[in-house]
């Protein structure tokens, strides 16, 4: 989970911000992140 969180964190910062990495890391639903700005980013990041 740590790898996914970090990987998506980099993408999230560039696209949406903290909300991206936080939502993806905590919930772990990938495309269903709390941050709507990184919707496509989260999907391609594969942070399930």
Swiss-Prot record:
Listed Pfam families: KRTAP (PF11759)
Coiled coil: none
Record's GO cellular component terms: cytosol; intermediate filament
Function description: In the hair cortex, hair keratin intermediate filaments are embedded in an interfilamentous matrix, consisting of hair keratin-associated proteins (KRTAP), which are essential for the formation of a rigid and resistant hair shaft through their extensive disulfide bond cross-linking with abundant cysteine residues of hair keratins. The matrix proteins include the high-sulfur and high-glycine-tyrosine keratins.
Domain of life: Eukaryota
Keyword field contains Repeat: yes
Gene (name only): KRTAP22-1
Keywords, in A-Z order: Keratin, Repeat
Keyword Transferase in record: no
InterPro entries recorded: KRTAP_matrix, KRTAP_type8/19/20/21/22
Oligomer status and interactors: Interacts with hair keratins.
Protein name: Keratin-associated protein 22-1
């Amino acid at each position: 989970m740590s790898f996914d969180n970090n990987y998506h964190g980099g993408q999230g910062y560039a696209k949406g911000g903290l909300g991206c990495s936080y939502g993806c890391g905590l919930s772990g639903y990938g495309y269903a992140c709390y941050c709507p700005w990184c919707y496509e980013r989260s999907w391609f990041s594969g942070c399930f």
